[in-house]
From Swiss-Prot:
Protein name as catalogued: Small ribosomal subunit protein uS4
Family membership: Belongs to the universal ribosomal protein uS4 family.
Known role: One of the primary rRNA binding proteins, it binds directly to 16S rRNA where it nucleates assembly of the body of the 30S subunit. With S5 and S12 plays an important role in translational accuracy.
Keyword Ribonucleoprotein: yes
Pfam families in alphabetical order: Ribosomal_S4, S4
Start and end residues of each S4 RNA-binding domain: 93-154
Molecular function terms, GO-annotated: rRNA binding; structural constituent of ribosome
Annotated PANTHER family: 30S 40S RIBOSOMAL PROTEIN, SMALL RIBOSOMAL SUBUNIT PROTEIN US4M
Gene Ontology biological process terms in this record: ribosomal small subunit biogenesis; translation
Cited InterPro entries: Ribosomal_uS4, Ribosomal_uS4_bac-type, Ribosomal_uS4_N, S4_RNA-bd, S4_RNA-bd_sf
Gene3D superfamilies per UniProt: Ribosomal Protein S4 Delta 41, Chain A, domain 1, RNA-binding S4 domain
Assembly notes: Part of the 30S ribosomal subunit. Contacts protein S5. The interaction surface between S4 and S5 is involved in control of translational fidelity.
Keywords for the protein's UniProt record, in alphabetical order: Ribonucleoprotein, Ribosomal protein, RNA-binding, rRNA-binding
């Protein structure tokens, strides 16, 4: 499946938020848009531009391209409840995102690689689809030959327990995680406003 391969740091500077952990230190040093006129860009932002920016934030944070993102929106509309919250929950339940949240990888891009390269299982079955929707009660663990990966061990060791969300139970010693429940919107601390995205698609 196609995915973004450009500089996430440049995109973060353009949108004004850190879209990945590695972009945080660069954004702190250069908190303005890239390019020759990045520091001088001022002026009132239109409503459409604000809505578009929020959509871009969500797409880049979760590593989703336009067609797939639009499909998530359509599914969110068809579900009961608040459309924006449904959209966030669908994105948070992606397999690669849950792997990232569990601390198995320091980034969603790295988590996507772990999934795509068949290192992980769900309920004992090999799953290599990053967009797979993880369900409450699902157990995620590593295949036997993948359990001694230094990169994963290092990521787990560097991930404080306080960073692991309450809806995921992680057994670091056995490199295993249990997806306890779908998170509520209030539990998601990401720098986007999904309601503006809903307004954009509702036009």
């Amino acid at each position: 499946m196609a995915r973004f391969r450009g500089s996430i740091t440049k995109v973060s500077r353009r949108l004004g938020v850190a879209l990945a952990p590695k972009a945080e230190k660069y954004l702190g040093r250069r908190a303005y848009a890239p390019g020759q006129h990045g520091q001088s860009r001022k002026g009132k932002i239109s409503e459409y531009a604000l809505q578009l920016r929020e959509k871009q934030k969500m797409k880049y944070i979760y590593g989703v391209l336009e067609r797939q993102f639009r499909n998530y929106y359509k599914k969110a509309v068809s579900q009961r409840g608040v459309t924006g919250e449904n959209l966030v929950k669908l994105l948070e339940c992606r397999f690669d995102n849950v792997v990232f949240r569990a601390g198995f990888s320091p980034s969603r891009a790295g988590a996507r690689q772990l999934v795509s390269h068949c290192h992980l299982r769900i309920n004992g079955n090999k799953v290599n689809i990053p967009s797979y929707q993880v369900k409450p009660g699902d157990v995620i663990d590593f295949r036997e030959k993948s359990r001694n990966m230094d990169a994963v061990r290092n990521s787990l060791n560097k991930t404080p327990d306080s960073r692991i969300p309450q809806w995921i139970q992680v057994d670091k010693a056995n490199m295993k995680a249990v997806f306890l429940n779908v998170p509520e919107r209030a539990d998601i601390q990401e720098p986007y406003n999904e309601q503006l995205v809903v307004e954009l698609y509702s036009k």
